[in-house]
């Protein structure tokens, strides 16, 4: 799969050809995770509506939930104003975090909300 050239020209990638993907749950608005994408991962995501990412540690693409069953059906994808981050709005099945938690941001609060 090849990324649409009209989309590709708008992306700003790091030295490794990657850009950030922020993943938000459609039903709750919760931020679930942050991951990396390359052009092919984004192209596959746009084509299939299955969240595809790029693993820097394994140096390969992966489909969220392909082994765990904790899938992400992609409702929408938006590009930020700088072109270096995409926002995926998803319907999450199971936990989004590799630990099994609902969100990767469930455990370590550094500053609590003020009432």
Swiss-Prot record:
GO BP annotations listed: L-histidine biosynthetic process
Catalysed reactions, semicolon-separated: 1-(5-phospho-beta-D-ribosyl)-5'-AMP + H2O = 1-(5-phospho-beta-D-ribosyl)-5-[(5-phospho-beta-D-ribosylamino)methylideneamino]imidazole-4-carboxamide
Cellular localisation: Cytoplasm
Stored InterPro entries: PRA-CH, PRib_AMP_CycHydrolase_dom, PRib_AMP_CycHydrolase_sf
Keyword tRNA processing in record: no
Lineage: superkingdom: Bacteria
Cofactor note: Binds 1 Mg(2+) ion per subunit.
A Pfam family per the record: PRA-CH
Positions of Zn(2+) binding: 81, 97, 104
Assigned keywords, A-Z: Amino-acid biosynthesis, Cytoplasm, Histidine biosynthesis, Hydrolase, Magnesium, Metal-binding, Zinc
Binding site for Mg(2+): 80, 82, 84
GO cellular component terms, A-Z: cytoplasm
Cofactor list: Mg(2+); Zn(2+)
Molecular function in Gene Ontology: magnesium ion binding; phosphoribosyl-AMP cyclohydrolase activity; zinc ion binding
Enzymatic class: hydrolase
Entry EC number(s): 3.5.4.19
Metabolic or biological pathway: Amino-acid biosynthesis; L-histidine biosynthesis; L-histidine from 5-phospho-alpha-D-ribose 1-diphosphate: step 3/9
Subunit-level organization: Homodimer.
Family (UniProt): Belongs to the PRA-CH family.
Free-text function comment from the UniProt entry: Catalyzes the hydrolysis of the adenine ring of phosphoribosyl-AMP.
Designated name of the protein: Phosphoribosyl-AMP cyclohydrolase
Organism: Mycobacterium leprae (strain TN)
């Amino acid at each position: 799969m090849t990324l649409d050239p009209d989309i590709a020209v708008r992306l700003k990638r790091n030295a490794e050809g990657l850009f950030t993907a922020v993943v938000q749950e459609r039903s709750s608005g919760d931020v679930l995770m942050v991951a990396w994408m390359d052009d092919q991962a984004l192209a596959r995501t746009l084509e299939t509506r299955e969240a595809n990412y790029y693993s820097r540690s394994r140096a390969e693409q992966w489909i969220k939930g392909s082994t765990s069953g904790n899938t992400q059906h992609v409702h929408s994808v938006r590009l930020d104003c700088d072109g270096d981050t995409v926002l995926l709005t998803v319907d999450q099945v199971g936990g989004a975090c590799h630990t099994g938690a609902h969100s990767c941001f469930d455990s370590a609060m550094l500053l609590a909300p003020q009432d």
